[in-house]
């Protein structure tokens, strides 16, 4: 038992280190305004101009110039969203439909993170929890093989895909974490 607790602690420390590295390498892309705007639209219902202004203002304050430029001018549609609050507000339903993800972003925003960082923290937290769930699921599947569980969990967590999903401002990592949580709950209920 102590051996598996020690291995779990080492795994958590490695996961934490990886999360810190991912935070340093965060990305800002064209999905970010949609999720930031979705949180603000709930805070300022019907005030499209204010939502539009605050969305792009908050991103501009944090994103490097080249990434912000890519967000607002990558193509004609993005340019239109940046220049026209009505056009931007018409896109928000495509983002607001991911209710749990937007609620998680809002939770971190209310904790004091900026909106762009709230999106990132939601994904990084989801990444960390997904890594824990991978470990727990593998531990359930291979109960007597602690080193195998540790090794597989570490390899899966350190895959570039895992990092890419953690830093991208979209709900993919969040959805993966929720899926793993349900799968783990299923395994615990039906051994």
Question: Could you tell me what each predicted segment is?
Answer:
Residues 121-142:
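Transmembrane-helix motifs of polytopic, lipid-linked glycan transferases
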Residues 82-92, 96, 100-122:
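Juxtamembrane segments of multi-pass membrane glycosylation machinery
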Residues 1-19, 23, 27:
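Start-transfer (signal-anchor) and selected internal transmembrane alpha helices
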Residues 105, 109, 135-143, 187:
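Membrane-water interface at transmembrane helix exits
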Residues 25-39:
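Alpha-helical transmembrane signal-anchor/signal-peptide segments
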Residues 44-97:
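Interfacial juxtamembrane loops and adjacent helix segments
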Residues 112-117, 141-150, 189-191:
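Membrane-helix interface segments
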Residues 125-126, 140, 146, 150-154, ...:
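Multi-pass, polyprenyl lipid-linked donor-dependent membrane glycosyltransferases
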